[in-house]
């Protein structure tokens, strides 16, 4: 298997671990509210994990794998377009989660606990199916269609995507 795909599969396993933590945190907010010991800290940690891991994973797919695979399949429709749309939906949910966590950290009460739970549950409901689509459709498609020179292009674009966000 191509090393980039191995990396993407590992990122999916990491995201699944994050989803377990998210489910635990949402459950605690529902049971204890944010006044429970460590609840706000856990939500802040999750916010950073989502920002760091999941969104960087999307960026690497969108800026490295999708453009090269798009040479073979129409990126305006089909699996690439569908996955890009799901990435956009996830980003909106992630923003709602961040907004709610920030409001709770600022001590606001009016419905923010419910909003953080709703956003967390929506993320948890969407991401597993998204991962399945990538692993069962997109990644096998890429493995079957891309030649070695194209994988070189994916690796180069991947490095550029990483370099664009890493501090110098």
Language model segments and positions:
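Small-residue-biased structural context
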Residues: 1-168
């Amino acid at each position: 298997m191509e090393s980039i795909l191995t990396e993407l599969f590992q990122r999916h396993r990491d995201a699944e671990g994050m989803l377990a933590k998210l489910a635990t945190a949402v459950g605690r907010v529902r049971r204890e509210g944010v006044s429970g010991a460590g609840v706000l800290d856990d939500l802040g940690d999750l916010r950073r994990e989502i920002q760091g891991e999941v969104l960087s994973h999307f960026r690497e797919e969108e800026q490295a794998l999708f453009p090269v695979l798009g040479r073979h399949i129409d990126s305006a429709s089909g699996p690439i377009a569908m996955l890009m749309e799901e990435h956009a939906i996830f980003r909106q949910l992630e923003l709602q989660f961040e907004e709610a966590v920030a409001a709770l950290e600022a001590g606001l009460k009016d419905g923010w606990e419910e909003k953080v739970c709703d956003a967390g549950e929506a993320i948890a409901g969407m991401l597993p199916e998204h991962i399945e689509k990538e692993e069962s459709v997109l990644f096998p498609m890429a493995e079957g269609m891309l030649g070695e020179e194209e994988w070189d292009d994916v690796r180069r674009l991947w490095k550029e995507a990483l370099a664009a966000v890493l501090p110098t």
